[in-house]
Swiss-Prot record:
Family from the record: Belongs to the RRP15 family.
Organism annotation: Drosophila pseudoobscura pseudoobscura (Fruit fly)
InterPro entries: Rrp15
Domain of life of the native organism: Eukaryota
GO terms, biological process: maturation of 5.8S rRNA; maturation of LSU-rRNA
Lineage: Eukaryota, Metazoa, Ecdysozoa, Arthropoda, Hexapoda
Bias kind Basic and acidic residues: ranges: 73-83, 232-245
Protein name as annotated: RRP15-like protein
Location of region: Disordered: 1-40, 56-120, 200-279
Gene Ontology annotations for the cellular component aspect, listed alphabetically: preribosome, large subunit precursor
Residue stretches of biased makeup (Acidic residues): 93-104, 213-224, 267-279
Length: 279
């Protein structure tokens, strides 16, 4: 019985705890309602402050008609820096893009007419593929080039040996060595070059064009040589070896002296005639 009496007060105290819980729940709900109301008002204020005036993505077909888009483009154009100079006395020409458009249209039309393989071979049109028929000609040209190089170096070696031998025979005197060095002639080297065992010309199917003959009326010797050889004179006359020994240049000062002497004699004769008349 004592146990039952001890348990009964606990059962009677249970409704008191339920009422306290209900009161706490009601207070919490009121606090939550107050917090949500305050948060909602704060969210509205922040949304109004942070609300952007820029429009979202628009359809491209309607972008030109949208006043907001037009306004943004005009503002961007106004922000671009301008030029601080003026054109005086001239007209400013505006560049036309018609030529570029025409070129693009031509290229597109050409690409449309060509097939895939032809379009791939367009950059290779300037290339020339070697033919098997030209192998003999190429081989002949290689032989000629090799023979010419070998012959040239042999001629240089022979010329150097001859020069060393002549300097050794001349002795230690500088005057004799200078005389030997002055006797070096280009024609001798060419004679040595063309007098070798392999000094022969081979005919190739690709003939060289003949140069036309040019004659000079001022120099008779030049015309005679040109008519005999039939080659074009591409050398300056001053650089020729016989320039100073030419007949016309050899006595150029004597002709002037003779002319001046004749003029002086004529003047003296005129003066003497005048004196005789006065007497």
């Amino acid at each position: 019985m004592a146990l039952l009496t001890a348990k009964r007060p606990k059962k009677e105290a249970a409704p008191a705890t339920d009422t306290s819980n209900n009161e706490s729940d009601s207070e919490d709900s009121q606090n939550v309602d107050g917090d949500t109301g305050a948060n909602a008002g704060w969210a509205d204020c922040i949304g109004k402050v942070l609300k952007s005036k820029s429009v979202g993505p628009t359809v491209l077909s309607r972008a030109k008609k949208n006043p907001a888009v037009v306004r943004s483009k005009t503002s961007e154009a106004a922000k671009k820096p301008g030029f601080d100079f003026e054109v005086v006395g001239g007209d400013v020409k505006e560049e036309d893009d018609d030529d570029e458009e025409d070129g693009d249209a031509d290229k597109s039309a050409l690409d449309a007419t060509l097939t895939k393989t032809e379009r791939r071979n367009v950059p290779l049109q300037l290339r020339v593929k070697p033919s098997y028929q030209d192998l003999e000609r190429e081989r002949t040209l290689r032989k000629v080039a090799t023979r010419g190089v070998v012959q040239f170096f042999n001629a240089v070696r022979i010329q150097q040996k001859d020069l060393e031998q002549q300097l050794a025979d001349a002795g230690p005197l500088d005057s004799r060595q200078d005389a030997v060095l002055n006797n070096i002639n280009k024609r001798k080297f060419l004679d040595v070059l063309m007098s070798g065992k392999r000094a022969k010309s081979t005919a190739i199917d690709n003939a060289v064009k003949k140069e036309e003959q040019e004659t000079d009326d001022d120099d008779e010797d030049d015309t005679a040589e040109a008519s005999s050889t039939g080659k074009k004179k591409s050398e300056w006359n001053v650089l020729r070896e016989d320039f100073m020994t030419n007949k016309k240049i050899k006595h150029w000062d004597e002709e002037d002296d003779e002319g001046s002497d004749q003029g002086a004699n004529n003047d003296e004769a005129d003066d003497s005639d005048d004196d005789d008349e006065e007497d």
